[in-house]
């Protein structure tokens, strides 16, 4: 009987999380400093926003190689991009091609 109660409680506790409704979009931050993209966040999903913060003294960009986003980032400024598709999205700074990264976006 204890096992039945435990299973019933576990199912009841999980019910609010299994309603099929997608989580609300989140904002993730990537800092650009010293000619590098900072650590890339985990847990990015379609619909989430990335806030790119340029702390460098130079203009940079966050430009997807597939054209899905392109944020120009003057020195000391920031910009946002919304992730519209799932997958591994390679990106680079169009002004400094050695600055690269890959964002992993889940559905």
Where do the PLM segments sit?
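Extracytoplasmic copper-binding redox domains, predominantly the cupredoxin/blue-copper superfamily
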Residues: 2, 8, 16-107
């Amino acid at each position: 009987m204890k096992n039945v109660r435990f299973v019933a409680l576990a199912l009841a506790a999980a019910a609010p999380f299994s309603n099929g409704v997608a989580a609300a979009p989140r904002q993730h931050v990537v800092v650009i400093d010293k000619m590098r993209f900072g650590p890339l966040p985990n847990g990015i999903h379609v619909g989430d926003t990335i806030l790119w913060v340029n702390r460098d003294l130079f203009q940079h960009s966050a430009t997807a190689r597939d054209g899905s986003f392109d944020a120009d980032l003057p020195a000391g400024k920031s910009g946002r991009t919304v992730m519209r598709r799932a997958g591994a999205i390679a990106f680079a700074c169009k002004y400094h091609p050695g600055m690269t990264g890959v964002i992993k976006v889940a559905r």
